[in-house]
Each structure stands twice: as structure tokens, then as C-alpha cells.
Amino acid sequence: LPLVVVELKSPSREATDVSEAYAQLRNYMQEIPSLFVYNAFCVMSDLATTKAGTITAGEDRFMEWKTVDGNLEDARYANFDVLFRGMFEKSRFIELLGGFICCSEKDGKEVKILSAYHQFYAVRKAVDSTLRAAETDGRGGVFWHTQGSGKSLSMVFFAKRLQRAMASPTIVVLTDRNDLDGQLYGQFAQCSDFLRQVPVQASSRAHLRELLAGREANGIFFSTMQKFEE
């Protein structure tokens, strides 16, 4: 059974567009559910607009893939060719399947989430930088996001990839606000199956020390910087 289902609409027919492609995908899900048992994501296109999303995504959550190989200078050219060459090159496709599609919860329902192109390429670079830092000065760098661009999920994807790259390291997430600590912890907790471990919030500096004592691998722990002043 297919891992990806693609629905194409003719650009020469004015009566059909990418919204019709999305509607057709939803029809397939209702009429041929077995086609989507192993589905990773879907693609809809009328050649003018091409987007990818998961079976739980609304039309507004299908996203363009704006670069073939991570070169942001080409990111303004989001088209059919860029998405297919960017997402379906064999090694990148395997990476997407293995570390950039996760399940979470929204309004009490399970949703499947596909990484956006900027998350995919930024996480790869961040992990490479972290590996170099581990061998040199310990400075991995800054992973910068604009508001609303999915930083919480980027951190989840980063943690997943880092687990494989560094043989299951222990990860401590430090923030400077209680609300942000709770937000990030909540996102990681919703993705615990994807991460194959349950994150833990440290209640105090002593608790964090206890969680880390004697640990040689695994574990994702959350704390705030203020706890170090207690």
C-alpha cells in the first residue's frame, strides 16, 4: 500500500483547483480507507499550487515545500518541481518518514503532523552543529524562530534526531518562564510515543539533581532557570 497519495488537478480547467484536489483526497479517505492505512502524508497540486499534509490536516494546514536542498535563496520558488524533488529524493524521503512525522493531540483528538520544510532543514543543521559542539567548545549555536512558526515541534524533531545521532543522550530543556516551561513540556508529553520516552518536569533544583544523578543515557527533563536560584 502507498506511503503517499497524490491528487493532481489540470491547470487548464478553470473549474478545478487545488481545493478540489483536497476535497478529492477527503473523498478517498471516506470511500477507500484501506488506501490510507500506511499513509505518511498526501500531496495536492494543480501545478500552480502544490502542498503536502497529513490525513488529519485541514486544507489550511497543507504546506508548500519551498526548497529542494535547504538553500533558502530558492525558497521563494514553491512549485510542483521543488516539492517533488525536495521531499521525494530517496534519502530525504526516508528521513521524513523516520524522524519528521509525529502524532500529537489537539482538542482531545489524535493528529498526525508533518514537519514543515524550514523545520526539516533547520533541525538537520542544528543536530550537525550540536555534534560538532560536543567535540569542540560545547557551543551549539542559536536556533531562531519567528512567532508561530512551530518552535515547539522543531524542538521535538530536534530531540528525536539527536537521540539517534548521539546514542540516546539525556536532554535538559531550560526556559526562563513558567508558562513556556509548561507549554514545551505539554508538547513533548503529547509526542511521547514518537520520542519513545515520557518527559518529566523538575519541581525544584534538588529534584532535577535527583533525576540526573547517575544517569548515563535517555531522559528528557524540563526546568526553569529560576530554579537554580532557589
Which role fits each region the language model picked out?
Residues 175:
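Conserved residues at beta->alpha junctions
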Residues 180, 201-209, 228-229:
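Short acidic loop-to-helix transition motifs that present clustered carboxylates
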Residues 1-170, 179-195, 216-220, 226:
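ATP-dependent helicase/translocase motor core
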Residues 195-201:
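Acidic/polar loop patches that form or flank catalytic/metal-binding clefts of enzymes
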Residues 203-221:
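Conserved motor-coupling elements within RecA-like helicase/translocase cores
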